[in-house]
Amino acid sequence: METKNNELQTVAEAIGPIEFTGLRLTAPPQYAAGVPAVKIALEHAMREMGLAKSIATLSKLNQKEGIDCPGCAWPDPDHRSNLGEFCENGVKAIAEEATNKRVTPTFFEKYSVKEMSQWSDFKIGKSGRVTHPMILREGDTHYTPIAWEEAFEIIGQHLQLLDNPNQAIFYTSGRSSNEAAFLYGLFARKLGTNNMPDCSNMCHESSGAGLFQTLGIGKGSVTLEDFQYADVVMVMGQNPGTNHPRMLNALEKCRQKGGKVVSVNPLKEAALVRFKNPQEVKGVVGNGAAISDFYLQIKINQDVALLKYIMKRLIEIEQEEGNVIDWDFIRENTNGTENLFKDLSQYTKAELIEKTGLKVGEVEPIVTLLAQKKKVIICWAMGLTQHKNGVDNIRECVNLLLLKGSIGVQGGGTCPVRGHSNVQGDRTVGITHHVSPKLNAAFERTFHFKPPTLEGLDVVHCIKAMYEGKAKVFMALGGNFLSAASDTNYTAKALQNCDLTVSVSTKLNRTHLVTGKTALILPTLGRTEKDASDGKSRFVTVENSMGRVHRSVGRIAPASEHLMSEPEIVSRIAKSYFKEDFSIPWNRLGTDYDFTRSKISEVFDGFKDYTERSKKSGFDLPNHTRRGDFSKLPGGVAKFSINQLPDHDLKEGEFLMMTIRSHDQYNTTIYGLDDRYRGIFNERRVVLINPKDIEDLRLKANEIVDLKSDYNGVERKAENFIIVPYEIPQGNLASYFPEANVLIPNDQFATISNTPISKSVRVSIVKK
């Protein structure tokens, strides 16, 4: 194997191949799940894991004392199904992690970094589990094996050579456990930096910011049980059939109890039309259950306009008939109502409706419904958060709920539906670039050092710092940072500017191939795998989307004897850096998870008797908003807010594009090449467009085009996309990420939250 020549690792491709894989189109189905979902899920499991391992993992998936799914953060019901408490994409996530495929030192000897970078993200991910710690030394073309101790020593040396701790960046993926994330945050603070960007910066940061400003807590207020008591559930900017399939059970139960479901989405998603529950007879041999009573195919990012229209109409009906707005709740628990009414008065209903692209007749039934009902849940995901005005979108949802008095009541409240399985837990246990004097004091009290007080860097700003040479070491606790971030080429250059990049990973991904001068892959245990120390079994804990903390216990043998758990990896790095400083017992923290949890309980409220309470069903963390308590806010009341209509400043010929996932995808992990629920098969390089727009542009279905964005005079291009006619509002486009991420500038992000504008990118279509 040739390891050193003129072919440096910097020639690695940031973007995969732009060839096509053979598009096949069908009419989108009118339902989700059912027998096809079971069949496809089991085929995937058998192909990746085989029979024995499939039984061992799936029988324990999301069960009490079992494996927490590494996919989404949707909560588990108190009473688990004996037929299996998982969904199609949960099975895919487990199969992806527990695959029998292996990426060994021989694999790395065979393939250079350059060659692997020319593969698709799908092919890279399907290579398998990394079995040994690997290093790409400066100037080398191939990764080579490295002993764990040497890897830790290299990281420690690079950190010691920094001019100051803020030249280091510690990124966290939502797959990491509470225990690992806590130690990671402790290490960064002890080192002296708050540079702790995490994946939530790119997704639900807008949710946390909007909710914290208005309600005093950055988490949702509802529980899973609330769905059975809700009069109305609004699902906005979210596609549960692909991203949170078990949520469909909750929506079905809501309707069975007499509740109504209102879906608001630019695309008609099959799962929001009809759901065939494969655990019920009618889901196997019948027609299943309708999910949405009303479906509004709104224009991209016009949710504020819709909500303002609804609130204007509710105020009108209140003035005419009364008993629509909860004045008792408003007087006792809020302020800012007068300013809200004044803001709404400056808009006409006609202009608001025009912005949405909807018709009055489509929206008025929802107005009537909300006027008559009190208990309202609003659910949302990236369709609301990934915009310049993402925080405004969330605050406007809160405005509607406050008008109805539907926060802190059974069957009503906020429901940001989180993506990665422990993204909320990581934040709870201290992964944040923000500075909290209270949190710093707790760390100082527990570990006897003064944490840094300088605000850290979030994702977009850490990329900028690396690009400008102001950050030298980048470490990722899980994730595929390059493919997840916006502005792919810019992000790639940023990573390549680093002296050292470190990835704690289970599987190969593109971030391992576009690296700093030196790069390390540190292979770790997955959720499915047994975690033991000195013969004693250990478990980790996670927090779901609704604030419940519970344990996850691995059940199968590790993919390799050379793997190390995340807490141990973090503690060993810390020990390597701090050497003779024994003020923090890193060894014990990395190996004794009970001890680590005891320290978490000393730093954070709500974790008393952590280890014992996390067993069985787990425990709920304190949530004052859930109780209708807003005392954490100034004045002790919730806040109405004033939010402007978005201005996308589209020029002639420009469209507003949103990046989306396919059904064979979770975050940056590509399970396959199909998007079954949209009738798109064996292809990812597609752009969904309204047939009228195709006609106006004199294009044809299946024609190949390029997509181009232009921000501040800088053009970015994504090449080779196939035109697919689709039911989407005129002027709007949709395309998959990470393929379309190259079009999103790193400096275009949400006000306050700094979340990239991945759901509202100005683009134009360029004919070939």
Report each predicted region and the residues it spans:
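Long, low-complexity segments enriched in small/aliphatic residues
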Residues: 588-677
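Intrinsically disordered, low-structural-confidence terminal and linker regions
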Residues: 1-66
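Short boundary motifs at domain starts and secondary-structure transition points
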Residues: 159-162, 367-368, 465-466, 645-649
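Non-catalytic alpha/beta scaffold blocks inside enzyme catalytic domains
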Residues: 206-399, 403-409, 416-599, 653-656, ...
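Long, structured ligand/cofactor-binding scaffold of large enzymes
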Residues: 143-146, 150-229
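Cofactor-/ligand-binding subdomain signature composed of acidic, glycine-rich
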Residues: 43-50, 58-166, 266-373
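Acidic/polar N-terminal loop/beta-strand segments that form early-domain functional surfaces
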Residues: 133, 171-173, 658-660
